[in-house]
């Protein structure tokens, strides 16, 4: 899924192995952006039948999975207000007339102070329930737009909440301490969602 190559020689070795295994398509090569998991962001959007963005929800990824098959999957997300990167993505989606769900993986690059977009997933993300944690049910948006034909207002879903799929102990052990106080507050306030556990 993801290979980190420190130099061109290693890159060529990895590409040779991938193609030797029978992979027939092109590969994407991206600049490696330094920083731990807390430099990641996820932006979930819904664009209506007219290609207008109606919902944006920014998640600050605090921890990702680190198993070989889990790399790139979020484990803990803290909702945060959408910033200037969201405005650019909104303009992009509307310029191309995009319709439906979109999910962007973004990383803050401390080298130049800018956010870098890795990819757009033309679907809901695996961690999509963090949007519900912020108070917005995206299935409801879809029904109101496509089935009921309603005109939807534009919403920035930035209500604070914490989404996690790992045990509390793991979260606090592996997330940098800068975020612990906010995580504890949200847990105490009942503003935490854990989609793998039902009460």
Q: What is each model feature region?
A:
Residues 51, 112-113:
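Glycine-biased flexible loop/turn sites that connect beta-strands or occur in inter-domain linkers
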Residues 144-199:
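Peripheral (often C-terminal) accessory segments that flank ATP-dependent C-N-forming ligase machineries
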Residues 18-22:
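Soluble sensory domains of the PAS superfamily and closely related sensory modules
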Residues 113-123:
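A short beta-strand motif that forms the metal-chelation/ATP-contact edge
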Residues 2, 6-9, 13, 31-97, ...:
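ATP-dependent carboxylate/phosphate-activation module, predominantly the ATP-grasp catalytic core
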Residues 23-25, 37-41, 100-102:
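Short, basic and Ser/Thr-rich N-terminal targeting/leader segments
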Residues 30-31, 99-111:
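A short glycine-rich, hydrophobically flanked beta-strand micro-motif that places a catalytic Asp/Glu
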Residues 27, 56, 154-156:
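Short, hydrophobic secondary-structure boundary micro-motifs
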């Amino acid at each position: 899924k993801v290979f980190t190559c420190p130099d061109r020689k290693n890159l060529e070795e990895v590409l040779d192995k991938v193609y030797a295994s029978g992979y027939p398509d092109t590969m994407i090569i991206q600049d490696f952006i330094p920083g731990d998991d807390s430099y990641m962001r996820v932006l979930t959007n819904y664009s209506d039948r007219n290609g207008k963005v109606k919902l944006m929800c920014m998640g600050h990824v605090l921890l990702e999975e680190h198993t070989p098959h889990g790399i790139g999957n979020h484990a803990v997300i803290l909702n945060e207000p959408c910033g200037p990167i969201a405005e650019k993505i909104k303009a992009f989606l509307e310029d191309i007339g995009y319709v439906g769900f979109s999910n962007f993986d973004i990383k803050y690059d401390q080298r130049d102070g800018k956010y870098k977009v890795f990819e757009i997933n033309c679907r809901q993300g695996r961690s999509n329930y963090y949007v519900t944690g912020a108070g917005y049910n995206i299935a409801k948006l879809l029904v109101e737009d496509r089935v009921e034909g309603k005109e939807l207002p534009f919403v920035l879903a930035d209500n604070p909440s914490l989404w996690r799929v790992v045990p509390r102990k793991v979260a606090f052990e592996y997330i940098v301490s800068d975020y612990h106080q906010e995580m504890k507050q949200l847990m105490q306030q009942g503003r935490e969602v854990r989609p793998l556990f039902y009460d």
